[in-house]
Amino acid sequence: MHEMTDSENTPIQPVSGTVVPRFAGPSTFARLPEIRDVKSCDIAILGIPFDAGTSYRPGARFGPQAIRQASRHLRTQYHPSYDTEPFMEQQVADAGDITCNPFNILESVEQIQTAATEMLGNVKSIISLGGDHTIALPLLRAVNHH
């Protein structure tokens, strides 16, 4: 678990549905703040909008956006089945999307691997919101690097 320092006196929290309606506000995962520099986080949510590796059925590139939109309705305070408050126990932030070249699969694999490797140098875990099955290879390479 992330040890809080004096400068990190409060955990990163989603925007409350009682303050801003769930249909408004940030389009991030679970309405968490978007933080590109994730050094103070335990877990980074990382979008990988890529589907150039698919045949006949493109559209997986819209996955990260769709997951973020659906996650607006998550109730994030307390999970009774696990008796936990996930966003109080871990620092979680949405790190945005990796920019991928939709016209060059090899270049995109390198871009994903480089971004994930750099991010894993700063956080304990990445939760990837993706695209097609191609994204698994560079993510596994990044994990293997660490």
PLM features: residue spans?
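Metal-dependent C-N hydrolase catalytic cores
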Residues: 2-146
